[in-house]
Amino acid sequence: MMKKSILAFLLLTSSAAALAAPQVITVSRFEVGKDKWAFNREEVMLTCRPGNALYVINPSTLVQYPLNDIAQKEVASGKTNAQPISVIQIDDPNNPGEKMSLAPFIERAEKLC
């Protein structure tokens, strides 16, 4: 009986840990569309961390970039190590001096929260 209780407890705690783990998806320029793609990479990963902190991750280097204010505050406070999103964000060819919109990526990442 004790072994079954311990096994049940371990299964519950491991499944709870899996649920608490941040979700990560990969999105590509092909999938999003060249006209909306905001990055200098062919694909990036998006994730939502506890507290709704959204990040873009470079799949080649695993460097992360804050996507919203919550994530930027985590980086500023030293809670998370990341580079500025401007490092991988491209210029908007239709609006000189402006960067491509991050809105489609923020929207996709929010669905992971």
UniProtKB/Swiss-Prot annotation:
> Which InterPro entries would you find in this protein's record?
YebY (IPR019648)
Which keywords accompany this UniProt record? Signal
| Any one GO CC term of the record | outer membrane-bounded periplasmic space
List GO BP terms, alphabetically.
copper ion homeostasis
Q: Does the keyword Signal apply?
A: yes
Is the keyword Ribonucleoprotein in the record?
A: no
Task: Identify the stretch annotated as signal peptide in this record.
Answer: 1-20
Q: Tell me, what's a Pfam family for it? A: DUF2511
Tell me the domain of life.
Answer: Bacteria
Protein name as it appears in the record: Uncharacterized protein YebY
User: In which organism is this protein found?
Assistant: Escherichia coli (strain K12)
